[in-house]
Amino acid sequence: MSKRRVVVTGLGAVTPVGNNVQAFWESVKTGKIGIGEITRFDTADFKVKLAAEVKNFNAKDYMDFKAAKRMELFSQYAVAASKEAMADAGIEMEKEDPFRVGVIVGSGIGSLPAMEAANQRLIQRGPSKVDPLLVPKMISNMAAGNVSIALGARGKCTNVVTACASGTHCIGDAFRAIQYGDAEVMIAGGTEGAISPVGVAGFTNLTALSTSQDPYRASIPFDKERGGFVIGEGAGVVVLEELEHAKARGAKIYAEVVGYGATADAYHITSPIEDGSGAAHAMTDAMKEAGVQPEEIDYINAHGTGTHHNDLFETRAIKAALGDAAKKVKINSTKSMIGHLLGAAGGVEAVVCVKSIEEGFIHQTVGTKETEEELDLDYCIGGPTRQEVNYAMSNSLGFGGHNAVLLMKKYR
């Protein structure tokens, strides 16, 4: 069976620097930082004071009050981004076979805030007072479930939970679903809403988070002074569509998805493998599927978390996968502006790749000033780049050794 071609026809985003794609992208282009003091809880006893929170989000702008009350933030963000993406794609569900429209939207964590609130209620008021909707509000698959309900999409509906690689795996699996004829349209991406006392404390004690109190120097991927990531939240969603289906309805085509690689490190629960071989194989697999050579890759949106291990080992992976071409490719980290959106990161970064292809614009890695000796690639330090982007790659690496890579190209 020959694989069908898959294109991107819609984009949606809720982020710390903009609650829709236009606002988000304009912020990214100007290097706006979405990091600030945590407002969700009192951080007096916490080493970490900063996070990248979504601002001025009102769920009632996207759904009725009753629906909003039945969802936690991660589901609300997913529904908001998915509705934007579908409106952008111009898909009218009443004209589609709903069983040929699917959803794969993942969350790495689900709702920690719901669990924390329920635990407090259990301790203070007893088991009979725990919210009866706790379970359907907190479990991670409810992002996909709520998107399906909100849009009337009745095809394949799943979620992938691979920590910080969730969003990229979701888009990759949606790509496969269309390639092999399981759907005509897929709504895919990632979402997260885990800025909470337990979440921040857990990541802090893991020594994963930056303890800097300077928003402009807290998330500094590839910098020699990097000290961890800044936790963020939001959602990023793309509408993928079978090419002929998109052409038949006169859709605007942003880009084509041409490669997907997924591997495991089989090494450690939090650290990538030191030689970068797992991520390198995922990149190589994506290029092999697309039939492109390393020197054809114009841009890599790196996982680039700002932790010591990730940035060093990901650099090694890029060098292993691209060889001499690694020195020429433009590499950046969107996390320098919006922090690490965990399961949503890959979804939002896929949106960045598509916009970079569309506009020929590669944003800078904001805040990063000076790298160490082994980090000797072009990390887009000091300013953005305007150039044609024919091929863009997006890397995501998750706790547990999960690696996911998407390769997109300019549609012709």
Regions inferred by a protein language model and the residue ranges of each:
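Conserved beta-ketoacyl condensing-enzyme motif
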Residues: 8, 24-25, 29-162, 191-200, ...
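Active-site-proximal alpha-helical scaffold in enzymes
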Residues: 78-91, 140-144, 148-192, 230-251, ...
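ACP-dependent fatty acid/polyketide chain-elongation machinery
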Residues: 1-67, 244-256, 351-365, 409-412
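Glycine-/small-residue-rich "gating" segment that lines the acyl/pantetheine channel
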Residues: 124-131, 169-172, 176, 192-248, ...
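Phosphate/pyrophosphate-binding loops at sites that engage ATP/ADP/AMP, CoA/4′-phosphopantetheine
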Residues: 85-97, 246-250, 283-299, 321-325
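A glycine- and small-aliphatic-rich helix-loop capping segment at beta-alpha/alpha-beta transitions
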Residues: 22-27, 113-127, 177-180, 200-213, ...
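Acyl-CoA/ACP chain-elongation machinery
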Residues: 182-227, 260-274, 304-311, 328-378
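Condensing-enzyme catalytic core mediating Claisen C-C bond formation in acyl metabolism
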Residues: 5-9, 36, 214-290, 299
